[in-house]
Amino acid sequence: MSLKEQLEHLQQKSLQDIQKVVDLDALNQIRVEVLGKKGPITEVLRGMRDLSNEERPKVGAFANEIKSDLAQAIEARKAELEAKKEAAQLAHETIDVTLPGQPVKKGTPHVLTQVIDDLEDLFIGMGYQVVAGFEVEDEKHNFEMLNMPADHPARDMQDTFYITKDTLMRTHMSPNEARDLESHDFANGPIKMISPGRVYRRDTDDATHSHQFYQMEGQVIDKNITMADLKGTLEYTIHHIFGEDRDLRFRPSYFPFTEPSVEVDISCFRCNGEGCSVCKQTGWIEVLGAGMTHPNVLKAGGVDPEVYGGFAFGLGIDRFAMLKYGVDDIRNFYLNDVRFLNQFTQEV
């Protein structure tokens, strides 16, 4: 039998074997046995050394053609077997689309987000704009424009997270008020803005202090603004958050960016003003600070204090949430304990 006849015989036998296999492993074994370096085709081709120079290239070309045909046959059979395997798997894993699906669990806003959203909705309803600002601030807007000179204790490295000599993590939300004063055109109307967000202090974390917490500050700048406007705004806000039955008390205080300044207390939730351990026997709980915008702050923002005046206020979102919901440790807001957070679920 000539080499060509041997190759034709191997081709026919291999094609029959390829069609007989029923799984991919057996097909791969045929591929190795037939087309591998130790396969029968290679063995037959070793006899080419006995051929004449004229016959050798013809037989070699014929052998390569057979190898190509067998490789194509193997790939075609592989595709058939893979299709059958996939069809069998799909038939086995048939899904009844008429079955009821499992309900998707809804998320819910974090309790601090709920308080922020509530306050934003309240002030937007009163015509205020919400300003976000920058968490990394410069000394000019965080201190200088707010009537806090270089020797002010709040600018000490022990109280503030400095990033560079002149940049820092904002210690309050007041820089946004300073930037608003700088850029505002009173031809478009007065300033009425609130600014909620994260602030940073060099505090040791404990039940009532945190190195990072949420504040909301606001300001109104216009002609003929009085302390009565501030008082009415804060009374409306506190009654909205804590209930109409809360009494308010305004105490004189000091803040560098307001004059006069006040701190606002509400009657104690537990004792209703009678005195207990929660209010330290005073009957009152401090909730925020406020005051009339200091003339130096107006001047720093390019606003004439002889023409315009205003008020500003600042409150702790975390503190509001603690008082409203009776939370005794500020750290609970940041531990992501689902058992704690599930107490404040809200439909969205």
UniProtKB/Swiss-Prot annotation:
The keyword Translocase does not apply. Mg(2+) binds at residue 259. Keywords: Aminoacyl-tRNA synthetase, ATP-binding, Cytoplasm, Ligase, Magnesium, Metal-binding, Nucleotide-binding, Protein biosynthesis. Its EC number is 6.1.1.20. It comes from the Bacteria. The keyword tRNA processing does not apply. Binds 2 magnesium ions per tetramer. Its cofactor is Mg(2+). GO terms for molecular function: ATP binding; catalytic activity, acting on a protein; magnesium ion binding; phenylalanine-tRNA ligase activity; transferase activity; tRNA binding. It catalyses: tRNA(Phe) + L-phenylalanine + ATP = L-phenylalanyl-tRNA(Phe) + AMP + diphosphate + H(+). InterPro entries: aa-tRNA-synth_II, aa-tRNA-synth_II/BPL/LPL, Phe-tRNA-synth_IIc_asu, Phe-tRNA_ligase_II_N, Phe_tRNA_ligase_alpha1_bac, Phenylalanyl-tRNA_Synthase, tRNA-bd_arm. Pfam families: Phe_tRNA-synt_N (PF02912), tRNA-synt_2d (PF01409). One of its GO terms (biological process) is phenylalanyl-tRNA aminoacylation. Its main location: cytoplasm. Transmembrane segments: none annotated. GO terms for cellular component: cytoplasm. It is found in: Cytoplasm. Tetramer of two alpha and two beta subunits. PANTHER family: PHENYLALANINE--TRNA LIGASE, MITOCHONDRIAL, PHENYLALANYL-TRNA SYNTHETASE. Belongs to the class-II aminoacyl-tRNA synthetase family. Phe-tRNA synthetase alpha subunit type 1 subfamily. This is Phenylalanine--tRNA ligase alpha subunit. The lineage of its organism: Bacteria, Bacillati, Bacillota, Bacilli, Lactobacillales. The gene is pheS.
